[in-house]
Amino acid sequence: LAILKAKSPSCGSGVIYDGTHTHTLAEGDGVFARLLRREGVCVVSEDMVESCKPSVEHPVAIVLGTGLGHLAALVKPVRRIDYHDIEGFPRDARPVRGHSFEATIGTIDGVPVVVYPGRIHLYQGYSAEEVTALVRHAHRLGCRDIFFACATGAVPGNAHVGLGILTDQVNLTGQNPLAGSNLRDVETPFVGMTDAYTPYLRTLARGVADDLGITVEEGVFAGVMGPCFETPAEVAMLRGMDVSYTGFSTALEVILAHALGMNVLGMTLASNESGDPKMSHQSVLEAAERHADDFERLVRGVLRLL
């Protein structure tokens, strides 16, 4: 990607993201711009970049999972919204430990955001439509980009404990937010799921991690119903399916966000190995605390480049 100054007669200087994902200013001209295009590099004007940046009209939505709600403290708030005032969100819902039910609209490092520091889950008895209510809300607020962060188990042999970027998913919940007769805001339920996790956002996140020295892995996510953790047989099945991470959320949210035309970035904190007999909700919270700084740096780094 090359971002070139639109007002320069020679297409000026801009930011070029090379194969190492580092960014440097480079002088260019009309010939340079044509050369970049010939090499398959996307060249866009500064004006176009400004029109696509997050704005008050198009904030970035961030949905946070178990133990990751601390990111909400980074927001310079303009407005707060109780989840129970969001259309479609169940009024009787109460947050589990590590979640909060108050969205914050504001900015992080000057970037307009809407942060949702908690979720509800299928295993609590809620429907696919209810667990995706936050996605519909973000879409109606004008969000074009949405980040999903979740706590997961790392499938032994395919991933390690730590931060990860989701590349694809397998929906094993038996539920789908596009099934049924209530298809508000969605043109058709027959949605192709190729690149449900937007490729350029994945590349951007990987580049930010490399630049900041943050260790991240990449892999496929499997969404399961929960609340039980995986049996050894289930872990073996997931390993054979080339699944790297498994968790109780995210899969349905990604389906709806993709169907709504939103750009999706999936990030995970693998707090344990799937099938670990010592696994508990408390251990997830403790792992989230250990990785809090790196997670915050990664999110802030991606936001700065949008």
Feature roles, as predicted:
Residues 10-11, 15-39, 44, 101-111, ...:
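Mid-sequence, gly/pro-rich, charge-dense loop/helix-turn segments that line enzyme active sites
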Residues 50-193:
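Metabolite-binding pocket within alpha/beta catalytic cores that recognizes anionic/polar moieties
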Residues 138-142, 239, 258:
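Non-catalytic positions within long, well-ordered alpha-helices that form the structural scaffold/packing
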Residues 144, 244, 263:
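Short acidic/polar active-site loop segments enriched in Thr and Asp
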Residues 186-197, 235, 287-300:
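Polyanion-binding loop/helix "lid" in catalytic or ligand-binding cores
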Residues 248-283:
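Zn-dependent metallopeptidase/amidohydrolase metal-coordination segment
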Residues 274-306:
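His/Asp/Glu-rich mid-to-C-terminal helical/loop segments that flank catalytic regions of hydrolases
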